[in-house]
Structure formats: C-alpha cells, structure tokens
UniProtKB/Swiss-Prot annotation:
Keywords from the named record: Cytoplasm, Histidine metabolism, Hydrolase, Iron, Metal-binding, Zinc
Protein name, per record: Imidazolonepropionase
Protein task: Catalyzes the hydrolytic cleavage of the carbon-nitrogen bond in imidazolone-5-propanoate to yield N-formimidoyl-L-glutamate. It is the third step in the universal histidine degradation pathway.
Family, per entry: Belongs to the metallo-dependent hydrolases superfamily. HutI family.
Gene designation: hutI
Species name: Deinococcus deserti (strain DSM 17065 / CIP 109153 / LMG 22923 / VCD115)
Length: 399
C-alpha cells in the first residue's frame, strides 16, 4: 500500500462529487489549513490538518491552495499541418469561402493529417497534450475527425491509443466533415464499417457528430448516433455553433453525454438541456479566437443545466493550449462565476465524458489535483497570461 498525507494546504477547494446543475455549481467546499490523505492513487480522507490521521509519509505543499485537476472534455489535439496562412487572411478580412477556395481551411488540415503516419501524429500531439497538462488538465478528451478517409480516422485514434501510455486521455470518434460527393454512402459506411471497427478495437469510448447546416443533418446525425449506441458507444454532438437546427434537441432525446458549442442556442435549446441529463459544454476559446458571440453560459446555469467548459484545442478555431485559460475566459466571456467555472472544468467536464471517479477532492475519487502558486484558489480564474498552477498531480503522483 502506498500512502501519503499532503499538508501545507492553505485552502482545499472542491465541488461535491458528481454532476452539478444550476445553482449547485456555485456550492463549493472550502477547507482552510487542510490536509489530504492519498492511498494507492485515491483520496482516502480530507479535513483539517489538526485532525489528520497519522501517516509515515508526509508531503508539505508549502501553504498553497489546492483544487481538483481540471478535465478538458473537448479537444482536437491530433492534427498535422497548420492554419497560420488562414489566420492571417481571416484577420485581413478574407472570407472563409475564399480561404477554402485557395486550398486552406479545414480541408487543408484534413489533407495534412491524412498524409501523416501514426508515429508522426503521436509526435505532433505530444507537446500539445503536455501543454494542456501543464495548464492543469489531468484528463483530456481527444477527438478524431480530420481524416479524409476511414483509414486516416483510424490512424488518428491509434495515435491517441499510443499516447494513453503517457496521459489520461479519453478517445472520441468524431464524424466531422461530410464528403463533397456520395454523402449517403459515406454515412452508411460510417454506420456499417467505421463504427463497428472502432468499437471492436476499443479505440473510442464515444462517437461525436458535427450537426450543422454545413455539416451533417439531424437525420444523418440520428442515424450515426444510433449505430454508435448499438455498438455500445456513448454519444455526443457538436451543435448550435452557427445555427440551431435541432442537434441539441436530438442529443437530449438520445441521452447524449454532452452537446458542445451552443453559441447559437436559443431558449428552446436551453430548456431542452435544463430538462435533460445531457451536459452543455461551452468553448470560450472559439469566442476569443474567432470573435463570435459567446455561448449562453449564464442563461444555461440559471435555467438549471449542467455546464462544462473545454478548450476545443484545434488549429482552425481555437488554438488554445490551456485549460486554466478557458476557465478564466468562461468567467469573462460567458458570465460564469469563479465557483461555477471550477465546477464546469472539473466534475461537470468529467460527467461530459462519462467519468464519475474524478473531478472532486473527496474520499473515493482519483487523487488528481493542482497545487497553485497562490494561497487563494481564486487566482485560478483571475490570472491571465501566466500559469497560476505550480504542480500537477495525477493519482497522487506529481507529473
């Protein structure tokens, strides 16, 4: 048995275990002058330092605040190529349609990714995942979705599988961009070939579909997600990024883990999420990078929804390599309070991935936690441009 008593905790701050909805997202537990006992990578006890159980191994954290490790529920961390020319063109006023016509946009990323080996994709993704972890993300979801064909999608997921030896990763098969021709045959192939293969090889725990006018229709999304559920996979949906066409309502009907983006969500979508068990995942890095309207985080919480926050790390719309930064942006751009943002980036983000064993500092939870530079946990939401995270601990081990 491996046991350590962590002391020197000015504030131990945590939401309760499990998904938090509405006003409950603001209800954090704060223990001052605290201690935490970790046994075999799992939290065994938390409380006042003066009441701490005896232990032969004591680690003094030095009088700083401790919070749960962050969970990033939405990334596209595996890609090849770059979008630097697109970025310069866009900020110079070039329309996206013209960028696509020049050979840029998402299809340039798809071409570069499809041309890359598994080994090359691993090497490209590793420093991105290291940056996320350094920012406080102890668990990270990674999607496929940049493959020009099914073989490229498989290589992306195989790269994630290799990287799972180094990081806590949750792999998702993303059905992202419809082909320019033969859509019906493509959707049929996804349902009858790609999803069964991914499920049989255990390369993903969930299937996500981009449901938008420019992507997959509601009916196509329904067909794909039904196939995923038939093969024992969880389901998620990208919806309401540009227009609300019914993807959110479909996700709630199907019991999806989460609906992600939601920048264009209106009252009907907010009410559907509030009445469901589906997590509303908002992505403020997209708002920052593209200058688009923010998702209605404040309205979602006030309606009683469970809100999570992710980076949406990707080369086109959110080149954001910090989970702490998007926590801070959720406060500034989406109207969350700091306690709500902490809940959104921990227990609710874990719930959006189907995880129940992490996100809170409580007995029985994985000992994933952050020691900050500050003695006040609110620096996590306050600081911009530098990391307030001093140490990252996964299963009781500093990484």
């Amino acid at each position: 048995m491996n046991e350590t008593l962590f002391t020197g905790i000015s504030q131990l701050v945590t939401p309760a275990p499990g998904v938090q909805r509405g006003a409950a997202m603001r209800e954090l537990t704060r223990l001052d002058d605290a201690a935490m006992l970790v046994r075999d990578g799992v939290i065994a006890w938390t409380g006042s330092r003066q009441q701490a159980p005896a232990s032969t191994s004591i680690h003094d954290l030095g009088g700083v605040a401790v919070v749960p490790g962050l969970v990033d529920p939405h990334t596209h961390s595996v890609w090849a190529g770059d979008r630097l020319a697109d970025f310069e063109a866009r900020i110079s006023g070039v329309p996206y349609e013209e960028i696509l016509a020049r050979g840029g946009g998402i299809r340039s990323t798809m071409r570069a990714t499809a041309a890359s080996s598994v080994e090359a994709l691993v090497a490209l993704a590793r420093p991105r995942l290291e940056a996320l972890r350094d920012s406080g993300a102890t668990t990270v979801e990674v999607k496929s979705g940049y493959g020009l064909d099914f073989a490229a999608e498989r290589r992306m997921l195989q790269a994630v599988q290799i990287l799972q030896a180094e990081f806590q990763l949750i792999p998702t098969l993303l059905i992202h961009v419809p082909p320019q021709d033969h859509r019906a045959a493509y959707v049929q192939g996804v349902c009858e070939d790609l999803i069964p293969w991914v499920a049989a090889e255990h390369l993903a725990t969930a299937v996500d579909v981009f449901c938008e006018k420019e992507a997959f229709s509601v009916e196509e999304t329904r067909q794909i997600l039904a196939a995923a559920q038939q093969h024992g996979l969880q389901v998620k949906v990208h919806a309401d990024q540009f227009q609300a066409i019914g993807g959110t309502e479909l996700a709630c009907q199907l019991g999806a883990l989460s609906v992600d983006h939601l920048e264009a969500s209106g009252q009907a979508q907010i009410e559907a999420l509030a009445a469901s068990d589906t997590v509303a995942t908002i992505l403020p890095g997209v708002t920052l990078h593209l200058g688009l309207p923010a998702a209605p985080g404040r309205r979602l919480i006030d309606a009683g929804a469970a809100v999570a926050v992710g980076t949406d790390l990707n080369p086109g719309s959110s080149p954001v390599f910090s989970s702490q930064l998007v926590l801070a942006l959720a406060v500034r751009l989406c109207g969350l309070t700091p306690p709500e943002a902490l809940s959104a980036c921990t227990v609710n983000a874990a719930h959006a991935l189907g995880l129940r064993d992490r996100g809170a500092l409580a007995p029985g939870q994985r000992a994933d936690f952050l020691a900050l530079h500050s003695s006040d946990w609110r620096d996590l939401a306050y600081t911009l441009g530098a990391s307030p995270v001093r140490d990252v601990w996964q299963a009781g081990t500093r990484v």
